[in-house]
Amino acid sequence: MSVRESLIKHLSSILRASKGTLLVLLCDQNGLSVAKIGRKTEIELDPNQITSLAAAAFSASEENWEDLDIKEQIISFSFFEMVCLITIRIDKTLLTIVHDYNEEWPLDADSLASSMYYLKQKLNEFFGTGQISESEIEEFSNKVRSAIYLFGMGTEVPFESYKPEGYNGENLLPAMSEVLDSIQNPIFIRYGLVGPSGLTLDAKEVSGENLPIGIEAFSANASVTFQKMKEESKDSSLGELLCYVAVSGEDAENFYGLITCPCGKLRFSDDEGESNIQEVSFIGLFSLDYGGIPVIGESRNIIYSILEIIGGDNITERFIKTVNDITSLKYE
């Protein structure tokens, strides 16, 4: 059996594990395809673009994790209108699962971890030193299992608005700040609203953790991460990028996540009276101790409340619908 045939055998087990999985690809860290396998679907999937997105999903957030001194990134979830791209680093390769979350969510963590075990073993045989121990392979597959499991777990947050009453319609920033203060679950370490240039509109530090990077620098880095992912996915058949989540950490007890999502468009006038429109993004750093469900639930509530203040936005509203759909699948 050739190297490619052997790899496709293991990719096939991932494809068969869920009816929602449409395509499984393996590429190097630059996005060069190594192997792939998929099933028939009405969704147009461009493998070259997906491998480019896989490479971006890890490189885009790299600076933030380095500045936070939180390593190594394990997995990322890139939610588009049509599918979610789940990307996992295996040594010097990237595995990407193209998954229709409307069909099934979350993924089976045990099944995926088992596939990771054999894939890492084979990749090391083919491209590594061949000297990796069984305990190292088990540690890796257990980290993937824990990250997948924890992201799909947690207490559901009721869908509600945090919009304050009687705010000043001429000055929306205080009302937006009040929304950020109104979250119901202490799940974020820090979170905020940023413009496309990385300028912080408002941000909150919650946990008091002594992080090596300030909140404004963190917010700017997170905004750049989201913009890079948006640029890479421009004109994609997958639809608009609705949410990007990256998970990093040494073990399951120390997993941290970065979430970035669209948060509408802020309309304002400059000093000369010219009307301007600025895209707003929501960014957050969180611990996975509480699971991923409350994180995306609180993010949705904050973003929904901000839209009530600054006005509707189609892409952001699709994010809200996606979160509602995912959580309803989880609790069916």
What are these regions (language model features)?
Residues 2-21, 29-188, 197-332:
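Acidic, low-complexity cytosolic segments
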